[in-house]
């Protein structure tokens, strides 16, 4: 394997009433949350899948299938911890992560530092190595109409040592 590897991913979930909105392990008060088998944390899913992609290990569904009852309601930060273990065993560490959340509401800015802290703690890297941004759908499409939420992630992994 190379000394530097790049991964990218996108995660999309439908927003529905009666579900918690959890992003980067932070529960955010909102009338809707993402529909999914686990806690449906689109941010953490995208980050985890970008790491899996950088390592050429496939996608989240390969490692944490939504057909497996043990992942029902799973905390996505725990799943990210398993992905970290895979990365560590392969001799890689985080160079940096850059992620974007696309959601019409609520405002993400008050929660970004907490998200970055949670992600950097699980990935055993400096908070400065984790960038999280948010943007709105400007009332366009399924994001703008508050029917769904999206997160994109790019990561660089570096060979340890």
PLM feature spans:
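Glycine-rich, mobile lid/loop segments that gate access to catalytic sites or pores
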Residues: 119
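Pyridoxal 5′-phosphate
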Residues: 132-136
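Short, low-complexity, polybasic intrinsically disordered segments
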Residues: 112-116, 146
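SAM-dependent methyltransferases
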Residues: 1-3, 160-161
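Short active-site-adjacent structural elements
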Residues: 109-110, 139-143
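C-terminal edge-of-domain segments
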Residues: 143-161
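Short acidic capping loops at alpha-helix termini that bridge into adjacent secondary structure
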Residues: 126-129
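RNase III-family endoribonuclease catalytic core
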Residues: 2-113, 123
